[in-house]
Amino acid sequence: MRLHFRGVVLPEGEVRDLWVRDGVLTGEPIREADTIATAGWILPGLVDAHCHVGIKHGGGHEDRAGAVAQAEVERDAGALLLRDAGSPIDTRFLDDRDDLPRIIRAGRHIARPKRYIRELGIEVDDERELPDIVAEQARRGDGWVKLVGDWIDRSIGDLAPLWSDAALQAAIDAAHREGARVTAHVFGEDALPGLLDAGIDCIEHGTGLTDDTITRMAAHGTALVPTLINIDTFPGIADGASKFPAYAAHMRDLHRRSRDTVARAHEAGVPIYTGTDAGGSIRHGRIADEIIALTEAGFSPHHALAAGSWQARGWLGHRGIEPGAPADFVVYDEDPRTNLATLSNPACVVLRGRVHLRRSPVTVHR
């Protein structure tokens, strides 16, 4: 398939011609190419760096058809690269479909008994087994492992760490020996120091970050995926936790200061990327909402786009719009740098050189 696009290519902001042959961007014009767009704004494929293909909205496991439908929704929203931050089902069969987003898997959540959502993760009775389980998930994943760093401990009625510092050190070392990076679900404050001491590569949510842990993350290049649209569910979680008033108050407080927390991390230089936490309480296809939410935390539109597109792609080892790269990009009628809401309405999605959601070609720049 030979395709031609012309438009303002981001992030450079230059009007260029893009040529696609056999799913790959080329640096030279292609004769007899099918011109798809003669104007518009062209953005490297968006990234949902924290989602869960295979978890039903509202809870439970998806079947194969449901997992396909979730991936299709992500694609149509322009999210062409997904980091699946823990799924209870094997979604490798999706890799056989060239019309679905590329997925980077982190295996299954690793937690303790009664310290995470039932039936979603692997439950470790004895934390001395954690390094071996982490190594196994590293081999099954695509270069990532997902730990549950904290969760409510009903015996104390509030968030608390799941693992000792020694167990974390051994587990993260085991993952690194397998060539995998490690990320961890963390809502509160107390689990963060041990994870950072152990060399964790990424923190999910991070609502409990303090000035000290932010400084440490920035110094070590530890990434943050704040999942702001998921954090907005915290008040509802608190409302349903009347048996645990300290936990409920804690969750409300974490939500109240969440935008400020992310803003301080951004100002300190912590690498921040977009993730929706789709699957479970958040529906798939909301990457535009998460990018917009970053502007509520002090991001400029340019930096919010970077966190949800080209910088996130580079962090995950995928290329942007350049010769020799896979043709994974999105075309918009309006400039997303001046109106991020346009991200919710792509004119054309191109994945592996195939066109999806094509509307009438844009013929003017605005």
For every predicted segment, state its role.
Residues 45-51, 82-84, 103-107, 145-147, ...:
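Hydrophobic faces of well-ordered beta-strands that scaffold small-molecule active sites
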Residues 177, 255-335:
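His/Asp/Glu-enriched, well-ordered alpha-helical/loop segment
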